[in-house]
Amino acid sequence: MSPEPSAKTVQLRRYDLVPGVLDDFLAWFHAEIVPVRTAQGFTVEFAYADREAEQFTWAVSVPGDAAAFTALEQTYLASEGRAAAFAGQPTRVAVSQVSLVETVVEAGSRA
């Protein structure tokens, strides 16, 4: 199924966190990452924390296709805002999984 030109591309990001850092990670994420990502043109679709498993899952999107997402991602990765957000930060993510995903059921849909 190919997306329509006006569709958005969503990237799912899943992190296994270093034990004991979840609260610090969440504070940093809210204060630094969300503002930098949104300033670069991304939409944060959702973010969930699993305290018991010390995992964090979130998604960002960009209007358009995967090429548009990749182009904006490269701009973000090279941005001063991202560099500042990560400057001096300890390692909090032990393992990450990042992939582009497709919508199967729209948020708020009822089965």
Which residues does each predicted region cover?
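Short, flexible turn/loop "capping" segments at secondary-structure junctions
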Residues: 4-9, 49-52
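Short, structured motif recognition centered on aromatic/hydrophobic residues
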Residues: 9-14, 25, 37, 56-61
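An amphipathic, aromatic/His-enriched active-site/gating alpha helix that lines ligand/cofactor pockets
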Residues: 4-5, 27-46, 61-99
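Long, low-complexity, Ser/Thr/Gly/Pro-rich intrinsically disordered segments that act as flexible linkers
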Residues: 49-51, 90-111
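Short catalytic/ligand-binding loop motif for oxyanion handling, primarily in non-cytosolic enzymes
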Residues: 55-56, 67-68, 108
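Basic/polar N-terminal segments that are highly enriched at the extreme N-terminus
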Residues: 1-7, 106-111
